[in-house]
Amino acid sequence: MVTPKQIDFSSCVGADNSNGTLSHRRSPRNIPSSKRAASVAEEETMKKKMKMKKKKKKLDPPLIVRIWNEEDELSILKGLVDYRAKTGFNPKIDWDAFCSFLGSSIVERFSKDQVLSKIRKLKRRFHVHSEKINQGNDPKFTRSSDSEAFGFSSMIWGQGDDDGMDKEHEVNGNGAAENRTNESGEEMLKEHEEEVANTELLNENGAAKTTENGTSSGKERHDEDNDDDDELCAVQDAFEAVMSQGLSGYQKKLQLEKLMNLGNGKRRELSDEWKALCVEETRFNIKKLRFSAKLAEAANDS
């Protein structure tokens, strides 16, 4: 009788292990080790993401930044003029009622304290400009809206009315609040001089060169250059305000070049005369605005 031939599979699939299972099967111990590796990698990734988020939060700027612009300042000044006309020009202002009167364009973006702080700054700025004008100096408006803002301010504080703001925000009785006001006014007066405060011609050792009489030659030269630039700007401003209308581009260029090449004496004469006219015009506009305020007050009283 033929017995079946036993086939040996060991040559094809390898030898059996001690448990009788095929050697090509994976050990169950390999599965948890791979899961642990994946888990560790995932934890490292999460830690990196958390660190990045924390770092980003530190670097991110504040979400809400309150910035006043020219339109906001004019809105407040116009609002004060209208509110005073509505309340019969009462010198004592109810600031809570005024903030409600301003409307959502300001109130929704700024708090009452921010509004009052801005009004105090506008009031100080007006008094600084008024003092310079009364002394016969140019107020030097740096923005296009400064002249308009000064007009509204003169209607509010030009008569010297006490709006109660300074007393309401006094800090103590030793004059601390008053000192801050004076310091702020002095800072405004000096803000146009700070840019040229320390510009002197230096020698090789880093010291300012001095002349025989002990004065700084660099400072004198710098002052002369500033005077020349100021005179040129004044003459150019006068030309654009008085003569340039109706001229072609070429005519403007030709005549302006001639004015820029004038001698120092003639140029200084024209510059001084134009500055004097500007001061007179500013004073006239102030008087006109004050008269407008009186006229509006009389119309509301009758």
Swiss-Prot record:
Q: Where is the composition biased (Basic and acidic residues)?
A: 180-195
Expression across tissues:
Expressed in the apical meristem and young leaf primordia. Not detected in emerging or mature leaves. Detected in the vascular tissues of cotyledons and leaves, in hydathodes and at the base of flowers and siliques, but not in roots.
Question: Mutating residue 256 to A: effect?
Answer: No effect on dimerization
- Effects seen without this gene: No visible phenotype.
> Where in the cell does this protein reside?
Nucleus, Nucleolus; Nucleus
Q: What is the effect of changing residue 291 to A?
A: Loss of dinerization
**Superkingdom of this protein's organism:** Eukaryota
Question: Where do the segments described as Disordered lie?
Answer: 1-55, 158-229
Q: Which UniProt keywords apply?
A: DNA-binding, Nucleus, Phosphoprotein, Plant defense, Transcription, Transcription regulation
Q: Which GO terms describe its molecular function?
A: cis-regulatory region sequence-specific DNA binding; DNA-binding transcription factor activity; kinase binding; transcription cis-regulatory region binding
Q: Where is the composition biased (Polar residues)?
A: 208-217
Relate the induction remark in this record: Up-regulated by KNAT1. Not regulated by gibberellins.
Task: Give TM segment ranges.
Answer: none
Q: Which Pfam families match?
A: GeBP-like_DBD
One GO cellular-component annotation of the UniProt record comes to: nucleolus
KW Manganese (keyword) present:
no
**How is this protein organized at the quaternary level?**
Homo- and heterodimers. Interacts with GPL1, GPL2 and GPL3. Interacts with KIN10, KIN11 and FLZ4. Interacts with KIN10 and KIN11 via its N-terminal part. Interacts with GPL1 and GPL3 via its C-terminal part.
Q: What else is known?
A: Overexpression of GEBP results in a reduced plant growth, a delay in flowering, a reduced anthocyanin accumulation, a delayed senescence and an enhanced resistance toward a virulent strain of the biotrophic oomycete pathogen H.arabidopsidis.
Name assigned to this protein: GLABROUS1 enhancer-binding protein
